[in-house]
């Protein structure tokens, strides 16, 4: 075991897979020589060579097309889109081509592509860098969408993503890259895609979240417990597919649920979770399912995001309203 940041854990996972399977290739803008904008791939090109870890032109659609071509010819590509907001430039390749390859080929051609990309607020980026587009990607049939909330999950989920025979979008929250460390095994391990994690057990209310909002939810739970409430916190880990069974089991116990997301409220992951819980656990509910989310506006850039992003205070206020309903 070693203490790692999320950057280090992701780098370690990539290194592990490059060693394990010579068909794994890592590429994207500035991924090779510079080790990526956030130095996530630092040192990999030097260790594994330019044929396996390499830079691409600044053309997201080309990166996606290259990944698909490599995948259907036997490779296991790990492509990086420099920031999630740039996925608009490669959306056809990702959702219209890569995601549909197995279906189009009648199951004869898998597309084992891992699409890595940073996203999320809290680091004051320019426009189109921090956008939360996980809801759009989760609505694209054929894609799995994974969002780790810390270093341990980051390594295990990335290894599972790379070894998957279907395409996985692996979203890395920028605020979490170096914000804290966790004990991470140095050997290979996998975390199942599609399985949520109960981060904290409780009996009065369930907070459901993913990515950086998991940390905010845990902070909120700590404050709520000072007021005598027992709070369960669940990390989705994967927003496509969603582990509804774990969520239903929790809500059947607590009777109350608040879904927390950083993204805009409209048509988000939180709306899907709320709908599923309403369909499957409504008789167990003692209060309406609540959501904490950002405003339905274009993602603000730099300092403006400070008043836009949901935070611990918002979660506490909504949780108390739900508890007192």
From Swiss-Prot:
Keywords noted in UniProt: Oxidoreductase, Pyruvate, Thiamine pyrophosphate
Residues that coordinate or bind thiamine diphosphate: 60
Enzyme class, first EC level, given as a word: oxidoreductase
EC annotation from Swiss-Prot or TrEMBL: 1.2.4.1
A UniProt-annotated Pfam family: Transket_pyr
Parts forming coiled coils: none
InterPro entries: THDP-binding (IPR029061), Transketo_C/PFOR_II (IPR009014), Transketolase-like_Pyr-bd (IPR005475), Transketolase_C (IPR033248)
TM regions (residue ranges): none
Catalytic activity: N(6)-[(R)-lipoyl]-L-lysyl-[protein] + pyruvate + H(+) = N(6)-[(R)-S(8)-acetyldihydrolipoyl]-L-lysyl-[protein] + CO2
GO molecular function: pyruvate dehydrogenase (acetyl-transferring) activity
The organism's place on the tree of life at top rank: Bacteria
Function: The pyruvate dehydrogenase complex catalyzes the overall conversion of pyruvate to acetyl-CoA and CO(2). It contains multiple copies of three enzymatic components: pyruvate dehydrogenase (E1), dihydrolipoamide acetyltransferase (E2) and lipoamide dehydrogenase (E3).
Assembly and oligomerization: Heterodimer of an alpha and a beta chain.
The protein's name: Pyruvate dehydrogenase E1 component subunit beta
Lineage: Bacteria, Bacillati, Bacillota, Bacilli, Bacillales
Gene (name only): pdhB
